[in-house]
Structure formats: C-alpha cells, structure tokens
Amino acid sequence: QAGGGRIRAIWFASDDWKFDFNVSYDYTDEGGYPYYEVNFHEFSQKKEYDPIAYNRESSYRRSLLNTGLNIEHQADNFIFNAVTGFQHLNDRMFMDQDFTPLDYFTLEQNQRINSISEEITFKSKPGKNWQWTTGLFGFYQNMDVNAPVTFGKDIMNYFNRIMSSNIPINIEVPMGQGMAMHIMPSVNITTPEMNNDGRFKTPQHNVALFHQSQIHNLFEVEGLSFTLGLRLDYEKFKMKYNTGTPIDFNVSVKGEMSKNGEVIREIEMMPTTPLNIEARYKGNLSKDYIQLLPKFALQYDFNQGKDNVYISISKGYRSGGYNYQMFSNLIQYKLRNEMQEQSKKAIIEKAPKEYTEIVNEHFPTSGNIASLKDAVEYKPEYTWSYELGTHQSLFGGKLQTDLAIFYMSTKNQQISKMAISGLGRITENAGESESYGLEASLVANLN
C-alpha cells in the first residue's frame, strides 16, 4: 500500500520578492526483504536458488513529510535567497534477519527523525567581472531509534554450545594408583528467548559559513577566470544510548571418581544453582568536528566562449558518526564474559574447598572487549580532488567533445558492510585510497 501527494505555491509579492512554498507527503506499507540463498556450482557453472523461507514477520512502513520555503529578493546590487526545509520521518521495520525458517533472531526498528535546515545566501548579479556568493548554513536533526532484537530458541541453543566450548567440561585430577577425580562444570542458559532492547537518540548540529569569488578576465586576459572558494564547517554529534538484556542460566559441578578408567563413584560437587546477569550499556557519547574546505579553479575560455580548458583543486569532507548496530556485538561479548565470571565465582564459593583452586586454575578468564567509543564510532572522511579538462566545439559546432582526467586522494575512507553479528549494516573506516580516472564524451549533430 502506498500513497502521497504534493502541493506547490509560488507568490510574487512584488517585482523584487518571490516566495516559493512546497509540501509533500509519502506513505508506504509493504512486505519486505525477500532474500534467499544462492548456491553456485563451480564445475557446472550453474546457480541454484533456495526458496524464500521465513518464520517471522518481515515488513516496512514509512510516513515521510517534507516542507520547504524559498524566499528570493532581487536587490539593486545583489540577489538574496533564504531556503528553509523541514523533514519528518516515522518508520517501522520488522526483519527476520537470519532469512531462514530457523528461529535465530529478528529485528524491529522504529525510527522518528525530525530535521530542519536553513541556508541564507547573498550573491552578485551577473554581468560583472567579479562574481561572488556568500552564505550561512544551519542544520539540526534529532533521530530517535528504538531497535529491539529478539534472539529465538535456535540461536539460544547455539549460545549454549558456545558457552560449553568456552569452559572446561572435564578437569582430570590424577590421584595415584590408577585413581583420578574428574571435575565436570556445566553452564546452561535457561532463558528460552532473549530480548535485547535498544534505545538511541542521536541529535546532530551543523553550522557552515561559506564564500566563493570568481574573477573573470584575470590580468586583463579575456576569457581567463579564477575561482576561490572557502567553507568553514562545524558539526557536532551526540548519542544517548540505553541498550541491554538480562539472561538466566544454571551452573552445576559434578564429579566422578575413576579407577583405571572406570567410574567407581559419582559426586555432586555443586548442586544446580540458578544465576542471573544483565549486560547493559547506558550513557552518552559526543564528538565535534571543524573543517576548512578550500576550492581553487582556473579556466580559460576561447573561441567566443565555446571552448575552454580548466584545472580545479578542492577538498571534500564526509562527516563521521556512530554505528548503533555495533551494540549487539558488544552485548554478546559482555554476556559471555560475565557468564564466565559469575559461573567461576559461584563454583569457587560453593564447590568443595579442596577443588576450588583446581577449578580456578582451569576456568578461562574473561576476554577483552573493545572500548565502546572505538567499537561504535567511525571517523570523518577527507578527500582531495584534482581535475584537468577541456571542452571543444569542432566543425562549426557539429561535434562537441569533453575530456577530463582526475585524481582523488581519500583518507579514512568510509565503507558500508554487514555487522559481525549480522544485525544490520555499519559504516567503517577502511584507511586511505587513491583514484585515477579519464572521462571522455562525444556529441555529434548530424543535421
């Protein structure tokens, strides 16, 4: 189901003032994410497509409102523009994110985004050798995301197997004369379905001041122009997060006395003990950036402005941010570590004293978890671009040619990839990259 509409109204208040208002609304409610597995056979070079098979709902619903107002004033020596924009987005997504009939995990994501922007510019009127534009830009966005993840019974069984592989299931203590004591700890998750709630608020502020000047007929050379642009950009990101989940599990320790490999006595060293932990992250992150972005260009027009050659240099910037999808990974690691620590502590407290040191020696210590900031934050991307090109009009305008060569150097390049947990896509910095290119086009008029 989908629907929407758009209204636009233009009012010429006078010869010098123009008001352009528009509003649009879009609504969609649909099923979604028909993913399936593709099996490729190397020898036959054939592909087999598995059927689409889900056990949970997959759908998407979105409500989107956009409004804008453009005010233009033609003064004697300049043109004034003020562009105001507002956007409201409210959506809900259900995704069976294992894409199989098994009950692994499903994601529900509810987003509410409100953003407002304002750009005010003053620019010169055409016809003079000095053409300029000066402006101020402001932007604010508040995004509120509620994204609980449900882990079903099949993935809980998998977690149990992982926990079993992380603890010693049989600690053998030789006792001489063919006798041995076998200490067998056991950890079993009893929570049938785990609900990992996730609430994230990410306000973003951006302010920029910019100016661009273009000088025509530079040094009194007709057709030669130079462009200089500067943009001072300030951005601030915040994220308020509250996400986590409790889990119930049992810990027990059994013992077996053996002689020459045969069990002669079973001992309950620690009765089944229920435990509960909660892995949760709650707090705030904040980061701000300030950048000066220059642009330089030199162009020479000839043949009555029909042909030109040019060179340009500019710096680009893509802001950083936060991947809230990474919290699922952190919570899984934290659950594993805390389960190991609590299990070890309970065994040491309740098992017979003569065996606690042995258990303490063989039980694994908790692994290291990446810092929250390092795990969820990605850095801004910076790019320097260089381009040399020409436009030629040949054979009386019957053949138009464009040729350009370019080079781009990017630092902290941002790429999109699936999170390790499989719960959504994340943005990650991939390091540095260089791009070289050649672009050519021909347009012929055969009339």
Regions picked out by a protein language model, each given a short descriptive name:
Residues 138-304, 340-344, 359-371:
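Signature of Gram-negative outer-membrane beta-barrel scaffolds
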Residues 70-95, 308-312, 325, 334-428, ...:
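Membrane-embedded beta-barrel scaffold of Gram-negative outer-membrane proteins
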Residues 7-11, 69-73, 118-124, 209-215, ...:
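Residues on the lipid-exposed face of transmembrane beta-strands in outer-membrane beta-barrel proteins
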Residues 20-45, 49-51, 86, 92-100, ...:
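Outer-membrane beta-barrel and related beta-rich outer-membrane complex signature
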Residues 21-25, 84-86, 134-140, 228-234, ...:
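Transmembrane beta-barrel strands of outer-membrane/channel proteins
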Residues 1-30, 63-69, 114, 118, ...:
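Transmembrane beta-barrel wall of Gram-negative outer-membrane proteins
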Residues 12-16, 75-78, 125-129, 218-221, ...:
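Outer-membrane beta-barrel channels and translocator barrels
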